[in-house]
Structures are given as C-alpha cells and as structure tokens.
UniProtKB/Swiss-Prot annotation:
<comment type="subunit">
    <text>F-type ATPases have 2 components, F(1) - the catalytic core - and F(0) - the membrane proton channel. F(1) has five subunits: alpha(3), beta(3), gamma(1), delta(1), epsilon(1). F(0) has three main subunits: a(1), b(2) and c(10-14). The alpha and beta chains form an alternating ring which encloses part of the gamma chain. F(1) is attached to F(0) by a central stalk formed by the gamma and epsilon chains, while a peripheral stalk is formed by the delta and b chains.</text>
</comment>
<keyword id="KW-0406">Ion transport</keyword>
<keyword id="KW-0066">ATP synthesis</keyword>
<dbReference type="Pfam" id="PF00213">
    <property type="entry name" value="OSCP"/>
</dbReference>
<dbReference type="GO" id="GO:0045259">
    <property type="term" value="C:proton-transporting ATP synthase complex"/>
</dbReference>
<keyword id="KW-0139">CF(1)</keyword>
<keyword id="KW-0472">Membrane</keyword>
<dbReference type="GO" id="GO:0005886">
    <property type="term" value="C:plasma membrane"/>
</dbReference>
<dbReference type="InterPro" id="IPR000711">
    <property type="entry name" value="ATPase_OSCP/dsu"/>
</dbReference>
<keyword id="KW-0813">Transport</keyword>
<comment type="function">
    <text>F(1)F(0) ATP synthase produces ATP from ADP in the presence of a proton or sodium gradient. F-type ATPases consist of two structural domains, F(1) containing the extramembraneous catalytic core and F(0) containing the membrane proton channel, linked together by a central stalk and a peripheral stalk. During catalysis, ATP synthesis in the catalytic domain of F(1) is coupled via a rotary mechanism of the central stalk subunits to proton translocation.</text>
</comment>
<dbReference type="InterPro" id="IPR026015">
    <property type="entry name" value="ATP_synth_OSCP/delta_N_sf"/>
</dbReference>
<dbReference type="GO" id="GO:0046933">
    <property type="term" value="F:proton-transporting ATP synthase activity, rotational mechanism"/>
</dbReference>
<comment type="similarity">
    <text>Belongs to the ATPase delta chain family.</text>
</comment>
<protein>
    <recommendedName>
        <fullName>ATP synthase subunit delta</fullName>
    </recommendedName>
</protein>
<keyword id="KW-1003">Cell membrane</keyword>
<keyword id="KW-0375">Hydrogen ion transport</keyword>
Length: 183
C-alpha cells in the first residue's frame, strides 16, 4: 500500500471518528456490515471507483446500500463515491475499528507472518504488543503474507514493529551497500 493511500485512509478514519462522535460505534457497525458486501463481491469496489460509472448510478447504489443506516454513514458513502475511494473501504473500516478500540484502551494488533500462528504464539504476541504499544487489552489478528519470509510484523494503528527476516535482510543489504560505497 502506498504512503499516500495510508494518509488518505488515516484521514477518512480520523474524520469519521470526529464527525460521528458518540455514534462512532453505530457507524462502525454499519460500515462493517457494508464492508461484508464488498468482501463478498471483490469487483464491486473497482466498478464503483471506475470513472465510467455515472454519479447517478453511484447514488442509486448508495441509496440501496445505505438504506437504514445513519446519516453519517450515508454521507461517508457519498464521499467515497465522489472521490472514487470505495476500494479503500476495508482499510478505512479497519483503521476506524483500531481507533475506537484505542479510545477504549483496547487495540487490534495485526500480526503479519509467513505462516499461520498458533494460539500460544498469539498469546505471547499479545503480551509483547501490550508492553510495546501501551494498551491494556490487545486482540491479535493474524494475516498470512509469504513476503514476510519469517518473523513477524506487528501493526497497531499507525505504529509498526517490524521483526521480519525480510526487513533484517533489507537492513543488512543497506549496510553492505554503505560499506562498499565508502571504500
């Protein structure tokens, strides 16, 4: 994910948190349900973000999707449509969820590993994340990414601890390049 996308995702989540106020939990719940629709139909977000889809078609879809939702949620969906950012919905909802959890001194920590982790490893990572990130309660969600090679990348909101072999190899490569460049 590009740095600019991360900034956009953070901005959306922060704005949603601010605008929804005491209704944040409700808005988050509504968006999680809507996210399931997009999760089941992967091409839907790309289609809605496509410039060939007219504003009227987007509005019609939002009318159906947002039926029964709060005004804040509907307005947010309209903003995503206007900016053609439906493809970022999953990450925005995840970011908002992390912000809500953090405001309750609870955090969802993403543990990116090359292979699935065991329940025992999840407990150990939870304790490590509590100490490193400063949360009282931590829920660990494992995301498998073969690019990690080995080790783990822990992410809580905008904070990351990269203990992956891939990162260590990149650092080693940079040190070697610097050493060779100085000779």
């Amino acid at each position: 994910m590009a740095f600019n996308e991360n900034r956009v995702i953070n901005n959306y989540a922060e704005a949603l948190m601010e605008v929804s106020g005491k209704q944040t939990a409700k808005v988050l719940s509504e968006l999680q349900v809507i996210e399931l629709v997009f999760e089941r139909n992967k091409e839907l977000a790309q289609t809605l973000d496509d410039v060939s889809v007219s504003s009227q078609q987007q509005e019609a879809f939002i009318g159906i999707l947002g039926k029964g939702c709060s005004t804040t949620t509907k307005n947010f969906l309209e903003t995503l449509a206007d900016n053609r950012h439906f493809s970022l919905l999953e990450e925005i909802v995840e970011n908002l969820d992390q912000r809500v959890s953090a405001s309750n001194n609870h955090s969802l920590v993403i543990a990116k590993t090359a292979i699935p982790i065991t329940a025992e490893q999840s407990k150990r990572l939870s304790k490590i994340a509590q100490k490193k990130f400063g949360y009282q309660h931590v829920e660990v969600k494992n995301v498998v990414d073969p690019n990690v090679i080995a080790g783990v990348i822990l992410t809580a909101g905008s904070k990351t601890i990269d203990g992956s072999i891939k990162n260590k190899l990149v650092q080693l490569n940079n040190h070697i390049k610097q050493a060779v460049g100085k000779e």
